[in-house]
């Protein structure tokens, strides 16, 4: 017993000595940890680890409502060696970097519509595309007609900053010809149109119903026998169900009206009439989780991934309340999306692989 007590006292003394040493040398330890962490992060390129196939990463699963764990709406699609970003909400360009996916490698940005929360991360994206990739050409920005004004506005807003970057870093690092974005509008005369076909990848835009916001589209990606759809913002859409027939993955927006109604009531009770009106209005042009599930079932999708989540879901404990009875309406897996999730569809296979590139919601 005496030896046990002595051992305990010795262990406690060693712990205290260690703590005091760590405190005394915290600056040196901090510098060492920072150097080590920086070296590891700078060497990360998660694109290099992806096999040939079609991949979709969630770089923003949030909405305009504040949520520290979720950037604004954003998806990144990789097909072979091609990479396209779909929508770019606030904080999403930074999230791409944290995911170990360099925006400098983006071949283009595809916009579903021009709501502010889908474009307010465009400035950082085009800056990272230029500076991290030493790009010699602007970032192509695809979207329905009207995208020209969006791109022109951001280019004008960043024009002065571009001159600062060139003067400071030099044209070899930031070639003047690579600054900003360049609009690539397409016409949506019918329910669907091919946006581009290149090196085995086909991207199709299709109309959705986000009235009164027009134009509004979603996108289908096909590559080497694998396919996925991204809904954009929409009410439940029969056109989406038709165009996305048989996809491996459907990434669909979702708003739970019952939970938003509770936010509406709370805002009204606290004298916030404007916020209450907005909470009321947004319920009529989005899709409830159980409706998204029905669309996935009708389309025959292999997996449903919910994103652009309204209201904010700061904890996984809220997921059951958010989904309601959705799981009973779909024969496949349902995933409540979190920033940093990556889904892979290997070419020549029917499997769906999942990984996480950053830590998720608690």
Where are these regions (language model features)?
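Binuclear metal-dependent hydrolase catalytic cores
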Residues: 2-229, 316-350, 356-361
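Cap/insert and terminal regions of metallo-dependent hydrolase folds
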Residues: 2-18, 217-218, 224-229, 235-339
């Amino acid at each position: 017993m005496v030896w046990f007590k002595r051992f305990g006292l010795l262990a406690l003394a060693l712990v205290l000595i260690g703590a005091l040493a760590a405190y005394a040398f915290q600056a040196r330890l901090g510098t060492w940890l920072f150097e080590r962490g920086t070296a590891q992060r700078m060497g990360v390129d998660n694109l290099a680890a992806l096999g040939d196939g079609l991949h979709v990463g969630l770089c923003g699963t949030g909405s305009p409502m504040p949520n520290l764990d979720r950037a604004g709406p954003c998806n990144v699609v990789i097909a072979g060696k091609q990479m396209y970003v779909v929508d770019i909400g606030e904080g999403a360009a930074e999230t791409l970097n944290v995911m170990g996916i360099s925006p400098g490698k983006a071949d283009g940005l595809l916009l579903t519509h021009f709501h502010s929360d889908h474009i307010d991360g465009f400035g950082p994206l085009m800056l990272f595309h230029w500076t991290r990739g030493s790009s010699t050409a602007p970032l192509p920005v695809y979207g329905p007609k009207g995208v020209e004004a969006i791109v022109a506005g951001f280019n004008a807003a960043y024009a002065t900053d571009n001159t600062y970057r060139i003067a400071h870093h030099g044209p070899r690092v930031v070639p003047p010809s690579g600054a900003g974005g360049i609009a690539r509008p397409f016409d949506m005369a019918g329910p669907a149109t091919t946006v581009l076909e290149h090196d085995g990848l086909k991207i199709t835009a299709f109309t959705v119903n986000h009235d009164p916001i027009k134009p509004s589209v979603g996108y289908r990606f096909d590559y080497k026998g694998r396919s996925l759809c991204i809904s954009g913002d929409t009410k439940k859409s029969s056109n989406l169900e038709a165009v996305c027939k048989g996809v491996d993955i459907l990434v669909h927006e979702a708003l739970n009206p019952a939970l938003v109604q509770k936010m509406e009531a709370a805002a009204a009770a606290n004298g916030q009439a404007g916020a209450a009106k907005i909470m009321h209005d947004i319920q009529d042009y989005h899709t409830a989780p159980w409706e998204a599930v029905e669309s996935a079932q009708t389309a025959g999708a292999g997996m449903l991934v919910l994103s652009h989540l309204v209201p904010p879901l700061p904890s996984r404990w809220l997921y059951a309340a958010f989904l309601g009875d959705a799981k009973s309406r779909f024969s496949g897996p349902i995933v409540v999306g979190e920033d940093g999730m990556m889904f892979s569809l290997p070419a020549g296979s029917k499997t769906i692989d999942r990984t996480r590139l950053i830590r998720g919601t608690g």
